[in-house]
Amino acid sequence: MMEGNGTENSCSRTRGWLQQDNDAKPWLWKFSNCFSRPEQTLPHSPQTKEYMENKKVAVELKDVPSPLHAGSKLFPAVPLPDIRSLQQPKIQLSSVPKVSCCAHCPNEPSTSPMRFGGGGGGSGGTSSLIHPGALLDSQSTRTITCQVGSGFAFQSASSLQNASARNNLAGIASDFPSMCLESNLSSCKHLPCCGKLHFQSCHGNVHKLHQFPSLQGCTSAGYFPCSDFTSGAPGHLEEHISQSELTPHLCTNSLHLNVVPPVCLKGSLYCEDCLNKPARNSIIDAAKVWPNIPPPNTQPAPLAVPLCNGCGTKGTGKETTLLLATSLGKAASKFGSPEVAVAGQVLENLPPIGVFWDIENCSVPSGRSATAVVQRIREKFFKGHREAEFICVCDISKENKEVIQELNNCQVTVAHINATAKNAADDKLRQSLRRFANTHTAPATVVLVSTDVNFALELSDLRHRHGFHIILVHKNQASEALLHHANELIRFEEFISDLPPRLPLKMPQCHTLLYVYNLPANKDGKSVSNRLRRLSDNCGGKVLSITGCSAILRFINQDSAERAQKRMENEDVFGNRIIVSFTPKNRELCETKSSNAIADKVKSPKKLKNPKLCLIKDASEQSSSAKATPGKGSQANSGSATKNTNVKSLQELCRMESKTGHRNSEHQQGHLRLVVPTHGNSSAAVSTPKNSGVAEPVYKTSQKKENLSARSVTSSPVEKKDKEETVFQVSYPSAFSKLVASRQVSPLLASQSWSSRSMSPNLLNRASPLAFNIANSSSEADCPDPFANGADVQVSNIDYRLSRKELQQLLQEAFARHGKVKSVELSPHTDYQLKAVVQMENLQDAIGAVNSLHRYKIGSKKILVSLATGAASKSLSLLSAETMSVLQDAPACCLPLFKFTDIYEKKFGHKLNVSDLYKLTDTVAIREQGNGRLVCLLPSSQARQSPLGSSQSHDGSSTNCSPIIFEELEYHEPVCRQHCSNKDFSEHEFDPDSYKIPFVILSLKTFAPQVHSLLQTHEGTVPLLSFPDCYIAEFGDLEVVQENQGGVPLEHFITCVPGVNIATAQNGIKVVKWIHNKPPPPNTDPWLLRSKSPVGNPQLIQFSREVIDLLKSQPSCVIPISHFIPSYHHHFAKQCRVSDYGYSKLIELLEAVPHVLQILGMGSKRLLTLTHRAQVKRFTQDLLKLLKSQASKQVIVREFSQAYHWCFSKDWDVTEYGVCELIDIVSEIPDTTICLSQQDNEMVICIPKRERTQDEIERTKQFSKDVVDLLRHQPHFRMPFNKFIPSYHHHFGRQCKLAYYGFTKLLELFEAIPDTLQVLECGEEKILTLTEVERFKALAAQFVKLLRSQKDNCLMMTDLLTEYAKTFGYTFRLQDYDVSSISALTQKLCHVVKVADIESGRQIQLINRKSLRSLTAQLLVLLMSWEGTTHLSVEELKRHYESTHNTPLNPCEYGFMTLTELLKSLPYLVEVFTNDKMEECVKLTSLYLFAKNVRSLLHTYHYQQIFLHEFSMAYTKYVGETLQPKTYGHSSVEELLGAIPQVVWIKGHGHKRIVVLKNDMKSRLSSLSLSPANHENQPSEGERILEVPESHTASELKLGADGSGPSHTEQELLRLTDDSPVDLLCAPVPSCLPSPQLRPDPVILQSADLIQFEERPQEPSEIMILNQEEKMEIPIPGKSKTLTSDSSSSCISAAVPVPPCPSSETSESLLSKDPVESPAKKQPKNRVKLAANFSLAPITKL
């Protein structure tokens, strides 16, 4: 069903054919009013459409007669019987009348609802639920008739004879569907309970209803009980009717109600599927009954109507349905009654319309529905016409399969053509247009959907010659020549602007699990796995795990799993017969098989064989088993309930939820009943008789699950009672554990906390079963529903190329089909990580949307959809801990709610649900105070804070997935009592502010083993206060200096030792210790012992970069903590707001970045410095920059300080990097980054070099193009350095592997493409941006896109910035292009746009570019004709071009700034490089050097062509080397020749294939040197060879042209002198060419004697042409000095060998003709004009 048409009301205006004249008798039916007239149409609301515009009918009504031609003449007025004589007395009945049921219906209660209505063609019909109740009567003023057509036989009215016939239908909704009663001609022994009813939509007034009498051919008339017509949730229950009762039904009587004008349809039968399809309609209350209406007293005309036309056309429940036409007063005939012929003749009077769609030119937009396009075409153009043709032409192998399927479903003729053939689609459509013109006559309408100018001739012919009405649906770039011939013009972009997206044709693929039991326990797992793999391999199975006597297999889809289950069931696995099931068994099953309780749970293999994994079916199986064995104990009942309702995976839940998602919760609960015990312990519970008795109605309801339409509420009283007494609890797998409101009661899953694993739409690696566990209803109070306020759905992998508005609209439309959407929020449009959060109203709708829309294509990407749990997923205990950590730092442990929320979200990185705070009754209290709420920590929860706060430690292990933990040791002695010099040291008298940090000068290479030795003697810990004393005692003097005297802080220097750290004890004393409380292994990588960067708040990452940038500007990278805030303010010109990072104290913020910042000392005199890890990283970057600035990429250690000064303009100070010697920090850098070598007794630091292979260089060139493509989609063509890798992976769908390009670091790869990418450093942050040249190229492409989207390809200069921001999503910055105004910018883009002054102001216009293809061919000829050096400078190439073609070469005319850029855009043809003189040069690629030889070879042959099987030998003989196609990357000669389509092409088939030189390549230029292969064939000195340059290949040579300019007609004629001995018509034709045929040329010439050969005196200017390829030399008289050639003349080779010339005075004319044209490009006709103006053409095509 197409969206968007459901609100259309076909009865918004009064139907003329339902009205009666005021003076007419009520029993007269006037058929002249059965046809709508223009004057009968009342004004209607703009929301509604005219009836004929609605094409969503069940059958395509092609034979509708004209209202003006087929009025009352065909159907005269027919008197109807007196209605008053048919009224029945009103009799009171009981509230629930008894309705007898037929023997074929299921044994249902007498109150079982019956479905009336039906339709064909998909869902075109409508239906209603009718509950038995009191009978209807009618007191309305209007008349409605009921159709009697083929349908189900009516129930005998014997039980309804005393029914009441009065009712009031004033409550019917205005959009009530059409109704008609259907009966059957043949009497059946067993008649169904009810027939089908269609209700016509009513206007404000309600139609009068009449009694329906007995009909001829029917056993009896039926009274049909109905209920009130409401607009509630529609539903249906379907009758059960055997196949034999359906097929022979024929239409007996029919009144035309719905179709205007009436229709007589052909056919006899209808299909069962159309009648059985559910349809949506209103529900009928049980308070009203349907009256009986008398039809006209006529003879039956048994015309069976086909209700299904096979096209799958769908309609909405509010649209008119299929109606039957009748023939009054005529005898019945089984088939082919005269009325059909009459209707067909009337239909022929309507003008035909044909639609011809060039779908390759005007294609269906990506992700849009072709059905909607076809429907829109029919709605727009088909009114008042009959569809005669609807054809589209395309290559079905190239077109989207979904589009082809939709076109076929819409009965559009899809003609297949070969996409590689030139103009194949255009030729096919033109042929169809001509056939349409020959078949139909005016008046007729032709709708052409194309922009191709090739149709101009046909449109002109159809309009002016045939008188057709032409409607052209075209794109914006349509040619004026095409637009001129259409009567109506419609823009294709506007026509399809608001198309709905295409619905997914198939469900997303999900994996299915299969469980195998009874495996042998005495075999090793590998053998069992191999056996299972062999059994399931042909079904695509994979063994996931084997545990004990069970195993789990995974299959790619449900079908494969079911097929594997059938094949593997009872198979022998090492002596055991295995059991295969979709549902997992309890764990005790394999362990204790002898247990009686477990044995009752085990089902036989036969019962386990085909579980359908559906909630409804599982419920029915469980309830049916309970019904069959009501006497069994509670264990059997509970066991079956638990077992049979198991579902294997998350996808099953999604699939089941999507099936039942359209029903409301009450209906769903009514059909998902389970027999459950009333206690939480299922093993001890005893099922009550009341619960056991629920099984029967549950079984019947679930048995009819296929007959339930959406949103029906039909629960029986027994079920409603059961809802109050039974609790249905669902236990989801780990990924869905956040979605459940109930607590697990299984002893295996005793934990009440929710799983913290993240959601994933595809649980490929999880085998958790989805079990419906029995729970006590009291558990709901302990675990409230986390989705009470709706469910959030996360959408990722969104196409960022679409605008935000369009994305929001598409997501809204997609999710609205699965339930009510509360909101759609899009994340910021940055770094390709555009995401959306869609909030659905309830969990069921969200799960259904996840199942249906996962990998649904929106734009050019398939979105990834998953449920988002948000703050609801946090356990209360974790939330309590997080809340305490925030409030403990607040004054008085209280914070305003808004402030608390802000700090919480910034600190923990996720949203806070305030309602969850109210659940923490034992932790916090929320009080109303003043204008807001206050969150306070309860006194019982205020934990004692450490006096040191959260002191830092660099431990390498962490439980929070971060290597950084804040370690607090137990109490530790403040000093070493053994070595402390101050023996009277007192901890209580020690003032931390008095501690002075010592600075030392030491070698780290020497100091590191000493520290480890010191820790070894001190049992692993040394107090920092006494560390100098202990060191002196162990190793002698310690060189201590004052600050700023070249020393390094001792505390920092200690942390430079690998494996050693400084921690803080609980009493505030810093202690030197090993990281893992033991010495590190000798081979441990020191980097593994360093602290790693924490993964957390991106604000902290930004702050850490700012800290590095600030500290490296300080002397020795040290700053007092008291100076941090003012220095930060001065350095960054902004305040450092601690609260912005989620902290309340500065020390906490500084401690939050321990990977970059180290806090030295204690008390108020603490110092801040960079960690050793940050210093090494900083030094590495500086060293690489220094080395790259050197010409040799290396530096001698002795000259390092001088090189450092030159590079950074400051003196070298090693203490800036936290060490005392250069070698200490150089040794920390990995060998893959720099290397140390010894050269001439000098230590040299250099960058390790590795010669890259040619493949790696080529990949790097391709990588540069990828970078350009990636950055062009970024705002301002720049992005952060750290976002490149994820963005690259997201954009291209592959990883960026540095080794693939021959690098080990990403920065080195970027430095290898300096012409494309620049790396800008903004402090510690690096920014990637395109170079200036690439930026302007990208901007030019944006301007082209922007202007092409505008009308007339122009835009006012004042609107440029606004339109730019609207189109690309970010503002345009002029400073990025070093311009101050738009005018200056347009001057730099003169090759793309131009500025024009018009009346309204300055306008930016898109310039018209010249064809690059023709220029490419011309440049290729120049380069192939150049025989000097292997390369040619760009300037020389330009000069040669201008001198050869006498035309200046302006690259701007082709859309390029320079000729170099133009040549670089042809990478497969030429290579552009810079020579030693820094000149830009160009040369042919290796492939086109081969093409150059091929061109020279073919110039030596007749007609420049050669047989393919002779090519290799000829090439080897010509060039002198064997042809090896693999050298050029191709496997065969034919494939190699196909790789140079600009030079040659291959025609013919089989052994007759010929290699033909392209026409563009045939010219040989005299301005360039000749081919070396032809030097030996040059004439002697007395003779000269002159070659004529040609400008195009279709020109012809005219000999003896004098100075006067002859007419164009004379130039086309070949005029021969009378003394020429050559007879061109008698020369033999080469055997390789087909026989020619002579035919008149249609060229209309001026009045002249075309046969006459004019005799002209020979002039010295006449020349002869030498055919060098045939090695014939024709002398030219000495007096012939000049060669006159028309600019269009071509150098033509002789077709035949010429005999020797006996005299030097004789002149010969040799003619060459290429009879075959290239298929890749349609060339002008190249025909030889003979004396009689005949032309040569081949009879057959090879």
Swiss-Prot record:
PANTHER family: LIMKAIN B LKAP, MEIOSIS REGULATOR AND MRNA STABILITY FACTOR 1. Interacts with LIMK2. Pfam families: MARF1_LOTUS (PF19687), NYN (PF01936), OST-HTH (PF12872), RRM_1 (PF00076), RRM_MARF1 (PF11608). InterPro entries: LOTUS-like, Marf1, MARF1_LOTUS, MARF1_RRM1, MARF1_RRM2, Nucleotide-bd_a/b_plait_sf, NYN, OST-HTH/LOTUS_dom. Residues 791-870 form the RRM domain. GO terms for biological process: double-strand break repair; female meiotic nuclear division; oogenesis; regulation of gene expression. GO terms for cellular component: cytoplasm; Golgi apparatus; intracellular membrane-bounded organelle; membrane; peroxisome. Residues 1679-1696 have a biased composition (Low complexity). Keywords: Differentiation, Meiosis, Oogenesis, Peroxisome, Phosphoprotein, Repeat, RNA-binding. It comes from Homo sapiens. Residues 353-490 form the NYN domain. The modification Phosphoserine is found at S66, S760, S1091, S1093, S1571. The modification Phosphotyrosine is found at Y699. Its main location: other. This is Meiosis regulator and mRNA stability factor 1. Residues 619-646, 681-717, 1677-1726 are annotated as: Disordered. Essential regulator of oogenesis required for female meiotic progression to repress transposable elements and preventing their mobilization, which is essential for the germline integrity. Probably acts via some RNA metabolic process, equivalent to the piRNA system in males, which mediates the repression of transposable elements during meiosis by forming complexes composed of RNAs and governs the methylation and subsequent repression of transposons. Also required to protect from DNA double-strand breaks. It is found in: Peroxisome. It comes from the Eukaryota. The keyword RNA-binding applies. One of its GO terms (molecular function) is RNA nuclease activity. Residues 621-646, 681-691 have a biased composition (Polar residues). PROSITE patterns: HTH_OST, RRM.
